Amino acid sequence: MLALISRLLDWFRSLFWKEEMELTLVGLQYSGKTTFVNVIASGQFSEDMIPTVGFNMRKVTKGNVTIKIWDIGGQPRFQSMWERYCRGVNAIVYMIDAADREKIEASRNELHNLLDKPQLQGIPVLVLGNKRDLPNALDEKQLIEKMNLSAIQDREICCYSISCKEKDNIDITLQWLIQHSKSRRS
């Protein structure tokens, strides 16, 4: 009986307290952006991902929060589109292949170049170091240092080490996004 009442209350709350947020997911190619979207949308991991050409848009509902995700291709020819799709969103999610140490400098430069754009000032950023299940992957502390995240002072910034394959820290990432959608409205 108590479970039924709880479910009814949740349903009733969802009628009046729906949250929506829009975010843009960017990062260098092969960092796991589309895989991340698939994992949070369906819980499914696939090794056979095709690189995103241009962009994909997907809506994911978690509880009473609907997240509209713009997944932008990471190839150099699409990086000029990043700023356009980051304007006006609730958050920017920047994905890094934490196991590919050769691309960390390029990834850092792209992130800082993007965040230097005046029209993106103040938009919170969630930096995700994906592929933590691989040997030699950077942990959160190393990512913060190598990506020079402490230099970013004009916005909220958060960093997590995740594995889409093992689904490590996906829940905490979603919690940050959902909490962020609620805090931006108040």
From Swiss-Prot:
The cellular location(s) given in this protein's UniProt record come to: Late endosome membrane; Lysosome membrane; Cytoplasm, Cytoskeleton, Spindle; Cell projection, Axon
Instruction: Name where it mostly resides.
Output: membrane
Intramembrane ranges, chain numbering: 1-19
PTM characteristics: Ubiquitinated at Lys-141 by RNF167, leading to its degradation.
Q: Which reaction does it catalyse?
A: GTP + H2O = GDP + phosphate + H(+)
The UniProt family comment states:
Belongs to the small GTPase superfamily. Arf family.
Indicate what this protein is called per its UniProt record.
ADP-ribosylation factor-like protein 8B
Q: Which organism is it from?
A: Bos taurus (Bovine)
- Gene from which this protein is expressed: ARL8B
